[in-house]
A protein has these predicted regions:
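N-terminal "pre-motor" subdomain/linker immediately upstream of P-loop NTPase catalytic cores
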Residues: 1-79, 87
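Conserved ATPase "switch" residues in P-loop NTPase domains
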Residues: 67, 96, 141
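Conserved glycine(s) of the Walker
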Residues: 83
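A conserved segment at the C-terminal end of the G1
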Residues: 86-96
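Switch/coupling sub-region of P-loop NTPases
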Residues: 100-102, 109-146
Length: 146
């Protein structure tokens, strides 16, 4: 099974579940498990192990400029499947290569996996590493992210 016991329990309680998992040598996947017509349904999206560069994604130069900013809020919005997670992963990777900082993500679920390059990258998953987004955001400043 790709589900942990805790995830199985959450699915039984909530009748739906967002989660991610990886198959070695193949890919990572984001999945949404749900009930429909008395049966279980699931939708999977592939998450590549390799994070694409700005050039490969066709992102405008202004996105690279945003990654140089020492502070601020950047909103990446769009419909499902439009590339929000891929864009954010590319931005995190760019920062990870170009800077020497502490990157902290709060995700539901963790999608792209980031290795430490020039930054320390801590990825927290809601309901696995923290009880809620609110709790994670509240304690984030104590974890000294840049």
């Amino acid at each position: 099974s790709v589900l942990t016991d805790a995830q199985k329990h959450r699915f039984e309680e909530n009748l739906e579940l967002d989660f991610s998992f990886g198959l070695k040598g193949l890919s990572r996947f984001r999945a949404n498990l749900f009930n429909q017509k008395g049966a279980v349904g699931c939708v999977f999206r592939a998450i590549p192990y390799e994070i694409k560069t700005f050039d490969a994604l066709g992102l405008p130069p202004v996105v690279a400029d945003l990654c140089k900013k020492p502070r601020g809020l950047i909103l990446v919005t769009g419909p499902t499947g439009s590339g929000k997670s891929t864009t954010l992963a590319s931005m995190i990777d760019k920062i990870n290569i170009d800077r020497h900082d502490h990157i902290l993500t709060i995700e539901d679920p963790i999608e792209f996996l980031h290795n430490h390059k020039n930054c320390v990258v801590n990825q927290r998953e809601v309901l696995a590493d923290t009880h809620s987004f609110a709790d994670a955001v509240r304690t984030a400043l104590r974890q000294d992210p840049d």
